[in-house]
Design a protein with these regions (language model features):
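A SAM-dependent methyltransferase catalytic signature shared across enzymes that methylate proteins
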Residues: 127, 168-182, 195-199
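Short, glycine/charged-rich beta-strand-loop motifs at protein surfaces that mediate ligand recognition
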Residues: 158-159, 180
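Short Gly/Pro-enriched loop/turn and capping motifs at secondary-structure junctions
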Residues: 160-162, 198-199
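Short, histidine-centered active-site or binding-site loop motifs used for metal coordination
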Residues: 16-18, 121-125, 157
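A generic structural signal for alpha->beta connector loops
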Residues: 69-71, 93-95, 150, 176-178, ...
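SAM/dcSAM-binding transferase cores
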Residues: 1-7, 11-31, 38-42, 185-228
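Conserved beta-strand signature within the Rossmann-like core of class I S-adenosyl-L-methionine
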Residues: 150-157
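The AdoMet/dcAdoMet-binding core of the Class I SAM-like
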Residues: 25-146, 150, 162-163, 169, ...
Length: 228
């Protein structure tokens, strides 16, 4: 993992791919973390939130800027991101219950009480960064089974090494009975919001852009939503 200093904090990269923008003061990162934080504001999960893959806690600065005090349960096999977060953002540590563990093992041990589960895992491979294979097969049904009634899953997806992923995205959507997808002008990522209690795509898009404008994130005008 390569760590570089930025104007507002730190940047974590692997093979030249930015994994996380760790901002140390409340505000936008202008990255995928802004969308994930804005979704928490828009979806307003009333109870437990889980995050698979911590990546330095990049969501915390935009969450703070949006006035969200929600505590999250986070799990990751790599301790470096957590240690950087504790060192550079000590006042936000109380907002995160972090555990070093395999995501599947940890999730299997949890009760079905999550109102929101965010899958944000990544692995380096051949000079690039991809999603682990469990994102496409093991995790979707497991995440579905750990959601409370009306719970929602959010996947931060990347193209697989083969580059063909439409069928994989559609399969995840079917697992949850429906989904909305967010694509980006600036990133190859696709964020999938899956569940049975999601607003219609036009309504969700309007609310998400409003939250991003409030955050002053450049992503407010660079996202595109559709039904998956």
């Amino acid at each position: 993992m390569e760590i570089t200093q930025t104007e507002h904090g730190l940047r974590m990269s692997q093979h030249g791919v930015v994994i996380s923008e760790l901002r140390t003061t409340p505000g936008p990162t202008h990255s995928i973390a802004d969308i994930l934080a804005a979704l928490i504001r828009v979806l307003k999960p009333p109870g437990r939130i889980g995050v698979l893959g911590f990546a330095g806690g990049g969501m915390q600065a935009p969450l703070c800027a949006l006035g969200i005090e929600t505590r999250v349960d986070a799990v990751d096999l790599d301790r470096m991101g957590w240690d950087l977060f504790r060192w550079h953002c000590p006042e936000w540590v109380r907002r995160v219950r972090w555990k070093k563990a395999d995501a599947v093992t940890w999730l299997r041990a949890q009760p079905a009480d999550f109102d929101l589960l965010i899958e944000d895992l990544s692995v380096p491979d051949g000079g690039d960064v991809f999603k682990p294979s469990i994102t496409w097969d093991v995790l979707p049904p497991l995440i579905r089974d750990r959601l409370a009634p009306g719970g929602i899953a959010v996947f931060n997806l990347l193209p697989p090494p083969g580059g063909v992923w439409l069928r994989d995205v559609e399969r995840i959507a079917r697992t949850f009975g429906g989904a909305r997808s967010v694509s980006f002008d600036d990133f190859t990522n696709r964020v999938l919001i899956a569940g049975k209690s999601i607003p219609p795509v036009r309504e969700l898009g309007a609310m998400l852009r409003a939250a991003l404008r409030r955050l002053r994130s450049r992503q407010a005008g660079r996202i595109h939503l559709r039904t998956a």
